[in-house]
Amino acid sequence: LEKYTEQAGLTDSYSISGLPTAKGSFDFDGITDGQLGWAGVGQYHDQVNPAALMIYMGAIANGGKAAEPYLILRTESALGLPSLPHFTTRTGRLISSDTASALADLMANNVTQTYGASRFPNMDLCAKSGTAEVGEGQTPHAWFAGFLRGEDTPYAFVVLVENGGGGSSVAGT
């Protein structure tokens, strides 16, 4: 798990339009088998920066390599016409193409079977919700991360609601 989190970029600091992100961390020192199991589902001493998770979602969407994100300053050209961003720079391989394909299929099934595709009309969405515990007596953070499949909508995303409660019911609506 430690090797995978490093290779997948989940502990990296990324530069987004020149702005550095905080590194993620996983604590594997002296970990028991039970704690390793919890770490594997994000419920031990795991800290993942939302930007790193978004890049990981992009890697799943694109066969193992992600587009490098940047800030979108405007969505129209100087003439006032719609202009969607073009992502031309890619990361190195974060995960294998087989793993990316399997995860994409699982995430698509998750949307259909768990959240209901009707919540996301006209979208080929692959996503997973999560709840991040933040400390004793504090309301957990709600996560919803994924991507849109399709040539005309090649976008990965992360929604994080700090102290929002549970996963998709908060961050996935």
Residues of each region from the PLM?
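Short, charged, low-complexity patches
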Residues: 53, 167-172
